[in-house]
Amino acid sequence: MVAPTEIKFEVEWSNIQQGFTKLIRMIEGESEPAFNQEIMMMMHTATYRICAYKNPQQLYDKYRELIENYAIQTVLPSLREKHDECMLRELAKRWNAHKLLVRLFSRRLVYLDDSFLSKKGLPSLREVGLNCFRDQVYREMQSMAAEAILALIHKEREGEQIDRELVRNVIDVFVENGMGTLKKYEEDFERLMLQDTASYYSSKASRWIQEESCLDYTLKPQQCLQRERERVTHYLHPTTEPKLFEVRYGIIIWN
């Protein structure tokens, strides 16, 4: 057994960092030997030694720093170079990869969660890891993502086919980055979508009055309601449905 005096934080952290690097390479799809039992035990042992004999707070801080650096140095550049649908696909992919990374990495450091964080009342490793994405990636990309989704919804309203699964996956990014609440979804996407919806149907109503017969005009609102219900079913959050129907589509009055 290694004596406490022989344990050095830098050595143990290097073992943990080595395992993290392998995880990153695996998630990035790079050629990498399997993340095997030996590596997992090495990370578990290093975590135990740091928590038992050294400075668990330092390990906690290093964990956050490592994930933040990955988000800033790898994830953000991959998103900044893409636009529109390509950017949306990358964002959804990166969010899913980040969740996987946090889950796998935090499991290797579970002793830190159990022996230190729970006693100190600090956020869990999972929470810290997910917050790194929210603070470093989501915060920068959410505005562009919302605009790209609204552009797709506009295309669909105009009769074009869109990738609804993609839209739903990116909507999940908004919802899940609320960390248990709908705050991000409501403030960063839904609010803009409702404004865009009102503007769209206000413009449409003006044209319908001029171009459609009285009978056709009275049928338009119900047709639009049905299509908006379908959008909620396929990719919007269920709580959006009543808000959509409260939107006054310009001069369209539901009689």
UniProtKB/Swiss-Prot annotation:
Gene3D superfamilies: Cullin Repeats (1.20.1310.10). GO terms for biological process: ubiquitin-dependent protein catabolic process. SUPFAM superfamilies: Cullin repeat-like (SSF74788). GO terms for molecular function: ubiquitin protein ligase binding. Pfam families: Cullin. PANTHER family: CULLIN (PTHR11932). Belongs to the cullin family. This is Cullin-like protein 3. The lineage of its organism: Eukaryota, Viridiplantae, Streptophyta, Embryophyta, Tracheophyta.
